[in-house]
């Protein structure tokens, strides 16, 4: 039995749409029949091989897969055939190291990642660890669920990492595929939201989604305006892939403010040591989320409090999608229909 998949055979070259064998689950594995999968910027980096740790071609990218459990391997008891699940970036972790034992499996040094170190979700079928898939709420359809598997859980965890409490101010910098979901999660979590971007249509979207304050990041008085309107932000989540955006967000914080970074631009950021020390500013990175974070992020979406803006496409168009992604021409998220 074969399936259609998008395969990276050589870094920097177009993905190849081909028929490959359907994998069979071994002990402790499940076979997932994918109905849909989101497309993430990480998939583009995987295909280009431009991150310090690279995958090994040939491989199948993708890590926002949603579908049904099609087959159980031996010793699997947590799931049953027909269960609706999502397969995220974190394919598996060791469960034994200090990060794993303290609730930080996303920092496990032995973790495996879907669509990177193991074949991913740009295919009609795939293998998963039953302990690391997310159960989809009954009210959440496959299309809206797919972006939650990476974009959603990433910004949800990032917002938690800002330590902003209900009624306090948080900045969402960059209202793209991640940022538009971050605005919704932040509002659902009871935060006051300031949204910053350089494009008027993105700011209009943020306002439509409930942002309390929208800021043109190019305005020379952007920092002063935020400080005046909010008294300084309690926290900031930077999704923008820009060191300048990170530095600007830092300048908008009040004393004891926390900035969480989820964007991965090249280069470095320059932050003032004096202000960091005297104002007790915290700057931290945040990467995806744990299994518990994923469950919570999916529940928000299942309750209708968060809804990704996405458009459907076909796996055969993946190379054109990557081109549009590189050019910054994608609004919201892309979800591939894997039934076509």
UniProtKB/Swiss-Prot annotation:
It catalyses: a primary alcohol + NAD(+) = an aldehyde + NADH + H(+); a secondary alcohol + NAD(+) = a ketone + NADH + H(+). Its cofactor is Zn(2+). Zn(2+) binds at residues 40, 63. It holds the Pfam family ADH_zinc_N. Keywords: Metal-binding, NAD, Oxidoreductase, Plasmid, Zinc. Its EC number is 1.1.1.1. Binds 1 zinc ion per subunit. It comes from the Bacteria. Signal peptide: none annotated. Disulfide bonds: none annotated. The keyword NAD applies. One of its GO terms (molecular function) is alcohol dehydrogenase (NAD+) activity. The keyword Glycoprotein does not apply. It is an enzyme of class 1 (oxidoreductase). NCBIfam families: PRK09422.1 (NF006940). Belongs to the zinc-containing alcohol dehydrogenase family. This is Alcohol dehydrogenase. It comes from Rhizobium meliloti (strain 1021). The gene is adhA.
